[in-house]
Amino acid sequence: MGKILVLSAVTDDCYTKNSAYILKKYLADVQAGLDKYAGLIGADKRAYLLPEGSDTYGIEGDIYYGISNLTGDNPYSVAQNMEGKLPRPMIQDDFIATYKGDEVCVLTPEAARWIAVGSEVKAITVNVKGNSEVKEAKIGTPLSEVVDASGAKAVLVGGLKGEYVKPESLASMTVGTDFNSSSLTVIGADECIVDTLAKHMDQAWVNSCGKCVLCREGTLQYKTMVEDIIAGKAKMTDIDLIKDVGGLIKLGAYCPYGQNMPRPLLSAIELFSGEIEDHIKRKKCPANICYKKAAPYVILPDLCTGCTDCVDECDEDAILSKKGFIHIIDQDMCEQCGACVDACDEDAIVQVEGKMPRLPKKLVRVGKF
């Protein structure tokens, strides 16, 4: 059986642009490293796997185009990608991935360059306020010297497999050769951490290959739970569930992506428990970003008969009431489950978008408001 050495440039996530940067700036070094490694392992064939729609960067050789994914350095995933299939990894010590009868071996652009020139410098994508820039830093450099995050709320270190940290923590963290140094994304003080997590978990779900149940279902559940926090439908018990599920995923997920997928969400919960609790308990978003899609439930005073039927259906005790008095929904307590709507025969409970109707601020007798 022959060997084919594939340079896989499809490993970057949505926070990272390192592969394209390295191919564009250091193609000669990359090819030198590829040639050297091919000789070391006895690979008689070489190929390049680039993202769909990518530039060729002046590469001469066998070029394949595939789906960018977080398992793009796994030989089996690469072989599947080259065949035009959904790339999914195979994690098994004695398994040999093949493409057209040849054993598949994989290098990333950065790994190939390191073989040629040494691994003293790391490419890092820095994302600030929607702008991305790839910087280079020596291994061991404090992350605080790579990006100025002073005054920021948080920094996502390592993208979809990374973790959220406070800006002051960057001084004690250094540039390494692993994925934790692939990108630094600054979360501004005016941004909402829950809204940020919702976007993050949506990407985590999109990037799950779906091969193992824990990652496939875990990313979907996480995505749904964070969206529920934004919509005002979550409960504090959901946070405990997120933590419990995270432990299971880390232990049982199939590949390194799945095992690390819970890290960003769990780290954010640890750092921003107060802000997240404000969203859940008080329906309060400090950045005034969330709840715009979640129209609040109100009780129309001209239709309410003071029957208390809705009160019996509210598990959160969020309805202020007294028999014969116009009821009032406590917006800080309401979980927006909608159970009260079904209980009201008068159709007095509605969701309001835009301008709120005139409502009583305290209990008033029916017909007296």
Where are the regions that the model predicts?
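C-terminal accessory/binding modules appended to enzymatic or scaffolding proteins
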Residues: 121-133, 286-331, 335, 339
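Short glycine/threonine-rich loop-to-helix capping motif typified by GTGT followed
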Residues: 54-59, 165-173, 226-227, 268-271, ...
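Hydrophobic alpha-helical positions that pack around
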Residues: 3-7, 13-33, 40-143, 148-151
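Short, glycine-/Ser/Thr-/acidic-enriched flexible segments
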Residues: 11-12, 54, 142, 160-163, ...
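Ferredoxin-type iron-sulfur electron-transfer modules in oxidoreductases and energy-metabolism complexes
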Residues: 179-296, 301, 321-331
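Iron-sulfur cluster-binding cysteine motifs and their immediate structural context
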Residues: 213-220, 259-260, 266, 309-326, ...
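Eukaryotic mixed-charge, acidic/polar low-complexity intrinsically disordered regions
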Residues: 164-186
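Short loop-to-beta-strand transition segments
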Residues: 149-160
